[in-house]
Amino acid sequence: MGWYTWANHWARVLYHSRQIGEARQADLLVVELFGFLHDSCRENDGKDPKHGVRAAELAKELNTQFFELKPKQLDTLCFAITHHSGGDVSLDATIQTCWDGDRLDLGRVGITPSPQYLSKEAHPHIETALAMSIRGH
């Protein structure tokens, strides 16, 4: 999968996450960084179970060089990145917002987002997000 395809995915995740994050009062800096970093260490779009762990390590390396997160923010970002592919749900507004943004773009791999894995604030975005994923922008 080329960088162009990944850039479109990251942009859609960022778009969805920011909309939901504002409604949920999530930490938007963490949400935005998640959008760019969560799949940055993927080796392919198929099975790559360690890509989240690698991306969380990258986030730690980039902190203080390219962005300034407080320790709790960095922990939240790294947890969200590490566990974003597992199908978990979180009561933490920022973590769930990150996961919502990524899950709303599952249409790019032929999967319709399931409301049971999304916050209630994400539910109204499913149809639009699916259309965006299928169109590729």
Over which residues does each language-model region extend?
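Divalent metal-dependent phosphate-bond-processing catalytic cores, especially two-metal-ion Mg2+/Mn2+ enzymes
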Residues: 1-26, 37, 65, 69, ...
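Conserved acidic
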Residues: 5, 47, 73
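An active-site-proximal "capping" alpha-helix that borders the catalytic cofactor pocket
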Residues: 13, 50-65
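His-Asp-centered metal-binding catalytic motifs of divalent-metal-dependent phosphohydrolases/nucleases
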Residues: 28-46, 51, 55, 78-85, ...
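Juxtamembrane helix-loop transition sites at the ends of transmembrane segments
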Residues: 46, 59-60, 123
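Membrane-interface starts of transmembrane alpha-helices
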Residues: 70-78
